[in-house]
Amino acid sequence: MNAHTLVYSGVALACAAMLGSCASGAKEEAEKKAAEQRALLVESAHADRRLMEARIGAQESGADTQHPELFSQIQDVERQSTDAKIEGDLKKAAGVASEAADKYEILRNRVEVADLQSKIQTHQLAQYDGDSANAAEESWKKALELYETDSAQCLQSTVEALESYRKVAHEGFGRLLPDMKARAGAAKTDVGGLKVAVELRPQLEEADSQYQEAREAEEVNARAKAFSGYHRALEIYTELGKVVRLKKTEAEKALQSAKTKQKASSDLARSADKSAPLPENAQGFSKEPIEVEPLPNDRLNTTQADESAPIPISDTSSPSRVQSRGVEDGGRSPKSSMNEEGASR
């Protein structure tokens, strides 16, 4: 093998090595891009699922009706994610979807925070856990400042605020619960001793249901829910007791009014009797039985009955009856009459 052949062989081997290296690099690059694409697809799917759950959670909390403008703004962000996905920019779509999900969860937390703030203020619960109350206020203030600039940090601050507010409510309602339970129980017993009308039964059933739910919540240490249930039951029982007693009072007044009118009528009759007394044993006012004359129709019926009665037939076989009949004819016997008739002949 000459020198030229060796040179050509070396060059060929080098080119082959270079070509193999390039092919290998291209394959690795393609595999890398495919892996990145799969990762983006997974990330996008995860973001979409979280976005859907966050939106449903916000709606179930009532955020869409309590804060319609903010909810509409988040829907606009959600549409941007959909547009990016249509354009094939999965990375942008996933990022925007995560931002929209953060804001939906922030809005949901905002509804719960507002509810806890109202309860804490109404029942003055901050006095039972001042440290947690202060921490809650600080975290919530920070969340409001971060809403427009950093949704992830804003969401974290709302979570911290919620945890602190819940501690305040849990401690405060725990202090107030025994008294509220006792009051609700007393009201329940009070109504149980009353006669509740049929039309008021639905209110009684609602109160009983609230009371039972409060007991169940107390058993699982859900103090806020238990307090709320007992409080609502107390309100219904109290109002129901007022209505039942009012109806009873009205019925008693009506009965007393009727008795008063009856007494007044009796007094008036006695007064009239004293001023113009009736004759003793006056007809219609005597205790003796009254003789009632028959009506004209009754007389007519009596006469017709007499006329229709059969006339008794004389018994001619009795001498006494014949003699008696002869006496009635002028004192002449049948024999003398016959003699007189013969003489005349």
UniProtKB/Swiss-Prot annotation:
Start and end residues of each stretch annotated as Disordered: 256-345
Compartments (UniProt record): Cell membrane
Lipidation (S-diacylglycerol cysteine): 22
Composition bias type Polar residues, residue spans: 314-323
Membrane-topology annotation of the record: Lipid-anchor
Sites of N-palmitoyl cysteine lipidation: 22
Acetylation listed as a keyword: no
Coarse class of the protein's main subcellular location: membrane
An example Gene Ontology CC term for this record: plasma membrane
Keyword entries, A-Z: Cell membrane, Lipoprotein, Membrane, Palmitate, Signal
Signal sequence extent: 1-21
Keyword Cell membrane belongs to the record: yes
The family this protein is said to belong to: To T.phagedenis TmpA.
UniProt protein name: Treponemal membrane protein A
